[in-house]
């Protein structure tokens, strides 16, 4: 019997989960509470995952927001699991323990995460008593009791964070009136007390109001790793309006988007669980996480009521809900050196 056939028979008879090879350099990952599932960025239609990370050793229980750093490691923020952030190497597979973990002991409710070029972790907590961004130094491990704490006086409800190519921190949320606002702080200049560099808000932005719902990712921000354009997934609290607005790099004030993706043809639906809803590949594709293990990909420059250029669907039926999405692709500022040196 041929080896591949033998393995397939053993799997069928004894219920053994087959191991996958690590995903290729260009891949997109869904984060689903207790697991991470990866797919080639070239995939279209029903697709078997090229990488699955799941099992008790992973410690994943409430995984949602996730980011991939310049060394291709996964940084996974667990929403309710003892304020834990787990870091996994690029080729982590199956029931594999994280290479390291740290715990932000003063809080929980971790809704968003970003990593700068120095591998410092920026973690957004929405727990009311500690709401804001906590910074864990590069290579942190174990309990962290003295993390730098950044708050934004303009925001009363925090929702999402990102890091731009200058290593500055973007914070998205809602002000006291429920209006959407995205502030940029100069963390590249000063970590402990960063200056406010830009504030994107106002009627011309077209950003939808949506305050009043605790720990829902009704707004997710992501920065194009090549152009620094700002993508904003945005929905109203009642989910009657959904859009992705794209702003020019370093957009400031009451500035309109350069384009907006919205309408029934897009297939983009609302979201309610913690985790980042969108991610941007190095070639400018918008990747949108949808329920039932689906990913919608939109071509660079897509605008209006446009259908996705790719729909990646897991070949295994999945949960209705979703948690987060992360992308790894060559050519962007987040990746340097040899992608295989992991």
Please identify what each model-predicted range represents.
Residues 6-15:
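Bacterial N-terminal signal peptides
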Residues 1-4:
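Positively charged n-region of N-terminal signal peptides that target proteins for export
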Residues 21-342:
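Flexible "stalk/tail and boundary" regions
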